[in-house]
Amino acid sequence: MPRFRMTVEYDGTPYYGWQRQENGPSVQGALEAAVRSLTGESVSIRGAGRTDSGVHAVGQVAHIDLSRDWEPYKLRNALNAHLAMAGEAVAVLDAAAVTEDFDARFSALRRHYLYRIICRKSRLALEHKRAWWVSKDLDHERMHEAAQMLVGRHDFTTFRSVHCQANSPVRTLDRLDVTRNGDLIEIRATAQSFLHNQIRSFAGTLKLAGEGGMTPDDVRAALEARDRKACGPVAPPDGLYFMQVDYPDVIPPRRRPEIEMTEDAD
C-alpha cells in the first residue's frame, strides 16, 4: 500500500491529546476522520509523538498507508479541506510519498520540544492557552544553569509520570537550553525520545530554580534521588509545543508507477 509522511500542526487546546480516544476528541482521531471522509477508508495513523491533552504541535510527523496512490500535494490539500469542514484545529503542512520502511515513530533520530513561559503581572489574553503565565519574574540564567544538570544520559525517574509506561527511565537528553526575550522565557529540549511528562516536569522544576526555590545543585540532587517526590510541580500543558522531528538525512522517496504519474481526470 502507498505510504505517505505528513507534517502536522495543531492547537492542542480542544483535544484530549494525540492518541485516539473513545470518549473525547483527539488529533489522531481528527486526521483519521478526515481520511475516512476523503477516501472512505478506515485507517490508523501513526505519529512520531503522543502529545498529551492541551499540548500543541508545529512539526508533528505522522505516516499513513492508503489503498490508492496520490500526488502528495493533492493529498495535503484534500485533507486540509476536510479538516476545515469539520472545524478541526489541525492542519497538514506537508505530505510526501515514502517507502514502506519509513515509520514516523521508530525512524526518528531526535525530537525537539519548546516550552514557553511568559512572566508579567497581567494575565494573558492573546497568549491564553499558548504559554504558562507566571506573575513573578524568573531568573532565566539561573534556570539555564540548573538545566545543564539534566543534560546527558541519566535515569530520569524523578522527572517522569508515575503512569509512564516506558520500560526504562533511562534517556539521553541532548539539549536543555533556557533563553529569554522580553517577558518570554523559552525552554528548548532535544532527545531521541522523552518519558511521559518529562519536559513539563523539567519546566516546573526550572521555574522553581528561576524563583530561587532550587539551586542547580538541588536540581542535580533531585535527578540523582530517582524519586518523583523530589521533582518540582508539573508545568501545565499550555506552554508545550512539539516543534520538529529529525530523520536520517536521506530517506529515499517512493517511486510512483509510471501509469500513476498522470493527472487524475477528476
UniProtKB/Swiss-Prot annotation:
Catalyzed reaction equations: uridine(38/39/40) in tRNA = pseudouridine(38/39/40) in tRNA
EC number: 5.4.99.12
Enzyme class: isomerase
Tagged with keyword Cell inner membrane: no
Superkingdom of origin: Bacteria
Pfam short name (any one): PseudoU_synth_1
List of catalytic residues: 52 (nucleophile)
Annotated GO MF terms: RNA binding; tRNA pseudouridine(38-40) synthase activity
Gene3D superfamilies: Pseudouridine synthase I, catalytic domain, C-terminal subdomain, Pseudouridine synthase I, catalytic domain, N-terminal subdomain
Family designation: Belongs to the tRNA pseudouridine synthase TruA family.
Protein name in UniProt: tRNA pseudouridine synthase A
Lineage: Bacteria, Pseudomonadati, Pseudomonadota, Alphaproteobacteria, Hyphomicrobiales
